[in-house]
Amino acid sequence: MIKVLFICHGNICRSPMAEFVLKDIVEKRGLTSHFEIASAATSNEEIWNGTGNPVYPPAQAELRKHGIGKTVYTNFSEKRARQVTKEDYRYYDYLLCADANNIKNTIRITGQDVEGKVKLLLDFLADSERKGKSISDPWYSGRFDETYRDVVSGCEGLLAYLKETGRIS
């Protein structure tokens, strides 16, 4: 089982988009039994009285535009923001962040990354000008289409890496 946690600042835009994009891809490829996929925030800004906010409506719209959310596995209607924890570092194989600040804040919360689990999602791009870059935050840019494009590229790159390293076939 490959356990992937996507991380962004608030867990209402980039990281849930990545969570449900990867779920959609692995479901279409028949790989759901090989993965556990979730997402979390580095901040608690989207968590009120212990309850996280849902996926931001424009992020939901972008996912729906691409047919994501129609199956039980990809249904994001019950997804609520949550903050990353120390336990997440022990539990997940990959903690994939949207930007460098997310990496810094994840390590601040979880402790040193001695196992090399905390990375940028776009680190998995192969030979691309976007490799190792941040995924722009659509909360500020309004460009949910660009975020979606980067997330899909990162998820495809991750799957290619997992195939190359023999983790999936």
PLM-predicted stretches and their roles:
Residues G52-Y56, D99, C155:
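A structural signal for well-ordered alpha-helical scaffolds and beta->alpha junctions
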Residues D88-Y89, Y94, A100-S169:
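Phosphate-binding/catalytic loops
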Residues S15, D99-A100:
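Helix N-cap/beta->alpha junction signal
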Residues M1-Y91, A160-S169:
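Conserved active-site segments centered on acidic
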